[in-house]
């Protein structure tokens, strides 16, 4: 069993054992371990995954007769006699080690331990290829050099890594934790009466340089539902999306609770971008992929979640849209929810009550609408950034698209069993073991998006439009990764997906042919 993350001390797992003998998988797991034990945002975790997988790809590209690196192009070309499995492993390991040491300096012992297990000298830091005395030192230098080139390029990419990814745009919320000035806009939440108030997480992320996107807003979706319609009246679409979340909350089954919790990927987990790296590891094992195969797979997969982070955060910052916890409480507090809905009523005091999940171990019951809680860990009620679009949906759809393109099929075939009573959101849930199975990558991505409605975190539009964005992003990243892998033969300027279906199919076919050659 491989850990897909830690949440409140409990492992959320995908039920298979990864092959840590493969260098790419080994370093992918080291990346996920660092993420799960760090206080890190989904955005910066996606960047860490992308940089690590890209640095390994760049080192590997020097050993491939066709592929070119993302930073040094084809200027590094190792002589054929030195192109061995051992030397490739050395090169990608040094590249990953240098990259991760830069990204997670407080986890140096973890990365040193991996290098020690692999038998590599961490003090060998030279980037001068003329200093190589044999093929093994040449490989180590290649890894050091390609990692340095990538890190130098990314040092000023807009992420603000040097200041722990702190926001750089002086974002100020329109609403306060205890007062809503604009019901459409994001509200910071406090779970302790104002003692600790959410701060918007990485609101500058749309300033980060993407891997494949032409701009952060390349796939910006249409606006979400406004509070008022064109005539200045309450927009029923705004109300209806909140009623839909209330309905999900009222009717939560154990299976839906498991789905909400399995996909939550909150603090102390590998987060949503890391979840799909675990799925990539499963595909690697399922298809018996080699190091050459894995480096190409994770190159695309890592950059898919990275560009998804930039694009989804651009939408979040652009629209600054409210979360369900804010809209439901606001509409209820102002008696704006219709009593014609079976889950809404006015009590004897003239206040709006809703029939919904009442909190841990409370089941569904009539509660004041202003007290409504999403089905989440009580210490992490709702994420500290805007609703629209769903990051989960965007990350998942982008990753699923790359996995589909890489394998040439949507077939997935992974299952996970959640034991009875394993929930950390409430005790005795689920009452019996619940098995989650995903026949296709698309089904897994769709469930990840839907889980956010079960959990009361997102509205349907945020999910559906996030999925649509994710698929476009996945296609764009796939094409860009093939450009590098195929030696610059795939266009970097990607047209509309419908017009390049043949390109994607052809690129997938070429990749499969090279894998089987």
Show which residues each predicted segment covers:
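A short, hydrophobic C-terminal helix/tail in secreted or cell-surface proteins
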Residues: 493-512
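Short alpha-helical segments used as structural interaction elements across diverse proteins
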Residues: 7, 44, 449, 509-511
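Short, charged juxtamembrane terminal tails flanking transmembrane helices
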Residues: 514-517
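C-terminal segment of classical bacterial N-terminal signal peptides
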Residues: 2-11
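Acidic/polar surface patches and capping/hinge elements
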Residues: 12-491
């Amino acid at each position: 069993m491989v850990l897909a993350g830690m949440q409140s001390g409990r492992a959320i797992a995908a039920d298979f054992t990864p092959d840590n003998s493969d260098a790419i998988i080994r370093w992918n797991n080291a990346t996920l371990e660092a993420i799960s034990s760090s206080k890190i945002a989904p955005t910066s975790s996606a960047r860490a995954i992308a940089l690590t997988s890209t640095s390994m790809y760049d080192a590997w590209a020097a050993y491939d007769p066709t592929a070119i690196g993302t930073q040094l192009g084809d200027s590094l070309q190792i002589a054929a006699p030195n192109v061995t499995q051992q030397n490739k492993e050395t090169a990608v390991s040094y590249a990953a080690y240098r990259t991760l040491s830069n990204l997670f300096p407080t986890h140096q012992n973890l990365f040193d331990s991996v290098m020690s297990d692999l038998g590599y000298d961490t003090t060998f830091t030279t980037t001068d290829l003329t200093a190589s005395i044999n093929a093994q030192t040449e490989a180590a230098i290649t890894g050091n050099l390609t990692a340095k080139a990538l890190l130098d390029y990314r040092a000023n990419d807009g992420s603000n890594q040097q200041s722990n990814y702190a926001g750089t745009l002086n974002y100020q919320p329109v609403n306060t934790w205890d007062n809503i000035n604009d019901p459409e806009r994001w509200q910071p939440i406090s779970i302790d009466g104002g003692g600790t108030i959410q701060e918007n997480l990485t609101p500058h992320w749309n300033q980060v340089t993407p891997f494949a996107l032409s701009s952060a807003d390349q796939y910006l979706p249409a606006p979400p539902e406004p509070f008022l319609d064109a005539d200045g009246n309450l927009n029923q679409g705004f109300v209806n999306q909140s009623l839909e979340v209330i309905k999900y909350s009222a009717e939560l089954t154990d299976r839906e609770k498991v789905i909400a919790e399995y996909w939550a990927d909150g603090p102390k987990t590998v987060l949503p971008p890391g979840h799909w790296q675990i799925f990539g590891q499963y595909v690697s094992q399922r298809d018996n992929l080699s190091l050459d195969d894995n480096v190409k797979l994770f190159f695309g997969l890592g950059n898919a979640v990275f560009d998804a982070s930039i694009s989804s955060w651009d939408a979040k910052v652009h629209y600054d849209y409210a979360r369900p916890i804010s809209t439901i409480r606001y509409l209820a507090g102002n008696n704006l929810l219709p009593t014609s809905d079976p889950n809404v009523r006015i009590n004897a005091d003239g206040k709006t009550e809703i029939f919904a999940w009442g909190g841990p171990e409370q089941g569904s019951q009539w509660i004041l609408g202003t007290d409504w809680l999403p089905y989440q860990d009580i210490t992490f009620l709702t994420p500290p950034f805007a609703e629209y679009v769903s990051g989960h949906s965007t990350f998942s759809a982008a990753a699923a698209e790359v996995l589909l393109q890489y394998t040439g099929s949507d077939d997935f075939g992974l299952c996970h069993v959640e034991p009875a009573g394993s929930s950390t959101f409430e005790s005795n849930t689920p009452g019996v073991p619940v098995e989650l199975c995903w026949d296709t990558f698309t089904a897994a991505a769709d469930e990840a998006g839907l889980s956010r409605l079960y959990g009361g975190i997102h509205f349907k539009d945020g999910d559906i439009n996030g999925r649509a964005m994710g698929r476009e992003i996945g296609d764009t990243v796939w094409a860009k990764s093939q450009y590098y892998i195929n030696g610059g033969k795939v266009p970097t300027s990607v047209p509309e997906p419908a017009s390049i279906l043949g390109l994607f199919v052809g690129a997938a076919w070429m990749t499969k042919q090279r894998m089987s050659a």
